[in-house]
């Protein structure tokens, strides 16, 4: 009987942690902190949970600080894509804000580089 109570308690606790977890950036393309040979056509961000499209956004700025993202991102499930305007070599800054389906807001940022060192 004690074993059954312990197992049920552990499962209940694990479920509670999973339900209340925030979403995190799982991976990005271009990769976080990477250097790519040529400017990508889009930035793709994949998160650990599905996103609420109406409350999620991404902004990409180029080497001169001007925005190079081409409008609203496309969101499907846990993935967000945004097209990029033509831009040259240098450092790019990606800043994202998302609301996951569990209603938790998360934000973050990273850089990637186009061209040489």
Predicted feature descriptions by range:
Residues 34-39:
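Short, solvent-exposed loop/linker segments at the N-terminal edge
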Residues 43-68:
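Short, surface-exposed alpha-helix to beta-strand junction/turn motifs within ectodomains of secreted
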Residues 78-82:
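Short strand-edge motifs at loop-to-beta-strand transitions and within beta-strands
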Residues 22-26, 32, 105-117:
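Extracytoplasmic/periplasmic copper-protein system
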Residues 15-21:
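Sec/Tat signal peptide C-region and signal peptidase I cleavage site
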Residues 71-76:
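Short beta-strand segments within Ig-like beta-sandwich modules, predominantly Fibronectin type-III
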Residues 8-9, 19:
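Cleavable N-terminal signal peptides
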Residues 88-97:
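A glycine-anchored, Pro-Gly-centered beta-turn/N-cap motif
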